[in-house]
Amino acid sequence: AQINGTRLRPDQTIQTGDSIATGAGATLIFVVGNSSFKVRQNSRMSVERGGTLRTVSILRLLGGAVVSVWGQGPRRQIVTPTLTAGIRGTGVYTEVFAAQNDRSYFCNCYGTVDVSSGSDQVTSRADYHQAFWGEPQPRNGRTLTSANMINHSDEELEMLARLVAQRTAWQVMGKRGVKDGKGYLEDKPGQMHPTQMLGK
């Protein structure tokens, strides 16, 4: 892993303002303030400084993937080439697919997030994995579309939550839901994904 273009040393800490790059087979786990991050292999991102050295204001993911848990605090953002998410206090997974014109995948694993892509914008409220695609080109007239849960696990979120003395929504409620990307712990009639409400 590299920090600001230099190989990360075992005794080095990651701070806001740093740029991070991981190579093949590398995984990087770190904490900044009340937020924790697991950066996957072949990823490029930066953590931009908020009001203090220990507050992340923007996580900018240029490529690859990151799982993150965010404590309560001032409004923060995750920015990818095709999607922006306004974070309140939540656990999320974000991935940029370079081979698909930087198509971005975003899962609000639990919590409340404002998600936008192009002119499409929704508020996601999830107890259990509500997922989206930020499309590089409109699909059926939309740049924000629904997705299934992919490429991350409950256990990753639980581990990151423990690092910042938190518990996931499903740990608090004592049950797990259906991993269909809709965001609900129980499948009930009439439940809709937020993208189904766009244009209504």
Predicted feature descriptions by range:
Residues 1-27, 31-200:
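Flexible, surface-exposed loop/linker segments and immediately adjacent secondary-structure boundaries
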